[in-house]
Amino acid sequence: MAIIINIDVMLAKRKMSVTELSERVGITMANLSILKNGKAKAIRLSTLEAICKALECQPGDILEYRSDEDTGFVKKKYEGSTEK
């Protein structure tokens, strides 16, 4: 399972730069990059709220769920490991 954060689409719609979003939300460019690139393991609700406020959007506008099949992960039933 993967939750994807699609910030780029909303940035383009709002004609806002990553730098401007970073300043408005109060997070570093590095952390914003982690969110954008799908490397984040979690996001605080307060951060999500700040992003939505800055982009004038709803959480559903930037969050997307993808199943394991969509992301290419296969779980081994008996071994408990994952392969890609």
Swiss-Prot record:
<dbReference type="InterPro" id="IPR001387">
    <property type="entry name" value="Cro/C1-type_HTH"/>
</dbReference>
<feature type="domain" description="HTH cro/C1-type">
    <location>
        <begin position="7"/>
        <end position="62"/>
    </location>
</feature>
<protein>
    <recommendedName>
        <fullName>Uncharacterized HTH-type transcriptional regulator YozG</fullName>
    </recommendedName>
</protein>
<keyword id="KW-0804">Transcription</keyword>
<keyword id="KW-0805">Transcription regulation</keyword>
<dbReference type="Pfam" id="PF13443">
    <property type="entry name" value="HTH_26"/>
</dbReference>
<keyword id="KW-0238">DNA-binding</keyword>
<feature type="DNA-binding region" description="H-T-H motif">
    <location>
        <begin position="18"/>
        <end position="37"/>
    </location>
</feature>
<dbReference type="InterPro" id="IPR010982">
    <property type="entry name" value="Lambda_DNA-bd_dom_sf"/>
</dbReference>
<dbReference type="GO" id="GO:0003677">
    <property type="term" value="F:DNA binding"/>
</dbReference>
